[in-house]
């Protein structure tokens, strides 16, 4: 089988992290975002993966070569000379996606979930039509485009309703699809939207179905959702009884859902959790409080600091008795001085903060 991952462009929503690293290579749950998807695709029998990219493909090549060897698959980078939206990349990658008559997956690189690729492929084969989109149930469908089924048909899609005022359903597009190769005939090589142009045509022809996603789902393309997605991912590991998580019997673990790389160093009298990810070669000082946060590789949190609802970027330092909260994001190599308070916002790479940030701000 084959798959196309829509990587896209600059990752502006996840800045300042993406000023240093392309978004698919940012670590999520101590594993690069793209690796979560490649692992799941390979486990489902996918042998050919295309990445549709229009930003810094050269940085990705080294990592992708490693994944090719690791999983015994072929990975092709499809470089867009101009952004082609969500449908144009299918046409650009036609040579790979049409190399045989088997269906292919399409997925948004921002989406994290319990990827149901095997079940999705079996469901798609069973109904025999051209396409299937994965849908997930949400509590507030008025914020999204809602999928509405044909009367008396549990999966065939009748229409999409954008941000409905009245309740018409609670299933939304989850950004994962499977198509027969014939769908490429519906797409032109130009900037075009699969959601706004391709799907409505498939619905008119009665060729589009939906598949209900079980378990968690999140678009992690911006910091607050990255943190929420981390919580959901760690909770899913807990439900599975994953041995990757730090044992709750450790004296400094409070509330569980804590993932610590073996190379990280933890000081005395810390209180860590719930929902914390600590990456490789991170140093946590004595008496540190960590909650609902991500510490990326090489970062350092000094004694008695408080870090909550924060992403600490690579090689960044949080000073003694500092306090970070309210969706604070430190870029690469940022230094927060001792006893400094940061109340949200984004701090660009290589900055040193010597005064309190009382109101969320972008510090350049």
From Swiss-Prot:
InterPro entries: GMPPB_C, GMPPB_N, Hexapep_transf_CS, Mannose-1P_guanyltransferase, NTP_transferase_dom, Nucleotide-diphossugar_trans. Keywords: Cell cycle, Cytoplasm, GTP-binding, Nucleotide-binding, Nucleotidyltransferase, Transferase. One of its GO terms (biological process) is protein glycosylation. Signal peptide: none annotated. One of its GO terms (cellular component) is cytoplasm. Its EC number is 2.7.7.13. It is found in: Cytoplasm. Belongs to the transferase hexapeptide repeat family. This is Mannose-1-phosphate guanyltransferase.
